[in-house]
Design a protein with these regions (language model features):
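A helix-coil-helix interface module used to build multimeric assemblies
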Residues: 2-211, 218, 222-229
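Intrinsically disordered or highly flexible coil/loop and linker segments, enriched in small
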Residues: 48-55, 107-108, 141, 157-160, ...
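Short small-residue beta-strand/loop micro-motif enriched in glycine and branched aliphatics
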Residues: 127, 239, 291-292
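Short, small-residue-rich loop/turn micro-motifs
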Residues: 155, 159, 234, 287
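Glycine-rich anion/phosphate-binding loop at the beta-strand->alpha-helix junction
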Residues: 191, 244-292
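A short, charged helix-loop
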Residues: 228-245
């Protein structure tokens, strides 16, 4: 039974009203959908080469194939979980689901090319950076820019409002309220720029990163070029030399950038709390709300 009151974390319990938009990116359902997306696009890319055995897949089938992730349902995700209860392997369960779907689309003779030559981390290490990159672009950065615009607007509005600055909790020298707000504008702008400079890296190269199975099966194909082009088509950057897994360095860099932005926002909140305690500002009262 699904209910917010049964959540084990306040993130998707008490605070669900503000975090629910992220479920399209970070829920297990979303992860499964992104895995399906990568598998489908990979299958289509193999058809586009084409691999000899896939030359018979009509281009008209691509739209229906893409509907497997654009119209992916909760019921589809639940079926993946049912398959996983037997396989005890989450990515293999996605592969089996897609084979069922291909059979339903009349493409049963091509089903064994789903996940051809790949290891699970080829899917995980593309689906994960992809969902994170799209969550940042669709949700996080628009919200952050909205906040930044508000802070900048207040800084402009209060540009010439004088106030007494403090250091070490004691009165120091005069300043302007607008200038104090522009401190946060500058800090946020710099960190947003740094965040957006981080490339979303993906790993895609088979069991140990060298496309070994691919080369054995089709030595005439430049699989490194294929992998680079495929990952680029997803809006990601392929790591050229890997083991079975992605390096995760850029993923760590992204989270570190988010941490720095959160630190700035914490500083902003603490300054506002201080200004309220000094009666420079007063909290807005909402009818019906109680407490501090």
């Amino acid at each position: 039974m699904s209910h917010q009151l049964l959540s084990i974390s306040p993130v998707d319990g008490r605070y669900n009203k503000v975090t629910s938009v992220l479920s399209d990116y970070f829920s297990e359902y979303a992860l499964i959908r992104y895995r399906v997306r990568v598998e489908v696009e990979y299958f289509i890319a193999l058809c586009e080469l084409p691999l000899p055995q896939l030359a018979g897949v009509p281009k008209s089938a691509y739209e229906e194939l893409r509907k497997l992730y654009t119209e992916f349902t909760i019921e589809d995700a639940q079926h993946v979980k049912e398959i996983e209860s037997v396989t005890n392997h989450d990515v293999k369960a996605v592969e089996y689901l897609l084979k069922e779907k291909l059979e339903a689309l009349g493409l049963n003779e091509y089903r064994e090319f789903v996940h051809f030559g790949l290891t699970s981390q080829d899917i995980n290490n593309t689906a994960t950076p992809l969902l994170l990159e799209e969550a940042l672009a669709d949700v996080y950065l628009p919200a952050l820019h909205e906040l930044l615009d508000k802070i900048y607007s207040l800084a402009e509005q209060w540009e010439d409002v004088p106030m007494l600055a403090h250091t070490h909790g004691q009165p120091a020298s005069p300043t302007r309220l607008g200038k104090e707000f522009k401190v946060f504008v500058e800090r946020l702008e710099r960190q947003i720029d740094l965040l957006q400079e981080i490339e979303p890296m993906a790993k895609f190269g088979g069991a140990t990163g060298g496309f070994n199975a691919h080369h054995v099966a089709y030595p005439e194909i430049d699989w490194v070029e294929f992998g680079n082009n495929f990952v680029d088509s997803l809006g990601l950057v392929r790591a050229q030399y890997t083991t079975q897994i992605e390096h995760y360095d850029n993923l760590a860099a992204t989270f570190d950038a988010l941490k720095r932005i959160n630190t700035i926002l914490t500083d902003l909140a603490r300054d506002m709390w201080t200004y309220i305690s000094m009666e420079y500002f007063r909290q807005q009262v909402k009818k019906g709300e109680v407490g501090s």
